[in-house]
Structure formats: structure tokens, C-alpha cells
Amino acid sequence: MYKLCVFAGTSEGRELVGWLSCQKNVSVTACAATEYGGELLEEIPGVRVSARRLDEDQMRELFWKEGFSYVVDATHPYARSITGSIETACRDTGTEYLRLLRDASEVSG
């Protein structure tokens, strides 16, 4: 059984959580920083949801306690602070870190 934690701050993150929730031998915990994000994730069957901002210490505690196989960072591309905290907490706990990035878009004008 793979235990995954997905920080789902984008629509791609929610799509990933939905897809993972349908896979065999996969348990998913989805983290959102806001109540609204949590409500969207709670619509996906079989997913544990955390709808609150986690600081680095809280992330470390969660990763240790749950023993995730992987942590997926699907936060917004410009959310560098949270990405840094997730990376550090993963490194400190020996948890595999994966980053899901959307393609950059160009703005003309």
C-alpha cells in the first residue's frame, strides 16, 4: 500500500487527488491551505482532507506520524515559501518529495 500526501493548491492537484483515489493500493491524504480548498477536496470519495495551513514543524510531524511513501507538492507555481517548507520537511523526515508543475503561461501586452 502506498500512502501519499498531496498538497493540492491547484486544479491540477485536485485532478491528481481524484485520479489517485481511484487507484488500487493507494491511500491519499490531501492538504489544502483554505477551508474552500478543503471543501473541494472533500467532494472526492475516499480521501482524507486537511484544510488548514501547516507550518514546517506541523508538516514534519504529519510526515513522521503518517509515514507517507511520497509527498506530492501540487501547490501554485509561485507559492515558493510553501514549496520550500514542504521540501525541507520531506528532507528532514526522509520522505520522498515529488513536484507537480503546470506549464508556464505567457501573458502578452
What do these predicted regions represent?
Residues 6-8:
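Conserved N-terminal Rossmann-fold NAD(P)-binding element of oxidoreductases
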Residues 12-16, 37-40:
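Short N-terminal binding/cap micro-motifs at the start of the first secondary-structure element
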Residues 16-26:
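A short, Lys/Arg-enriched amphipathic alpha-helix followed by its capping loop at the start of a domain
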Residues 29-53, 108-109:
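N-terminal beta-loop-helix "entrance" segment that forms/cooperates
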Residues 56-57:
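Structural motif corresponding to alpha-helix initiation and N-cap regions
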Residues 60-109:
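Glycine/small-residue-rich loop that forms an oxyanion/phosphate-binding "nest" at active or ligand-binding sites
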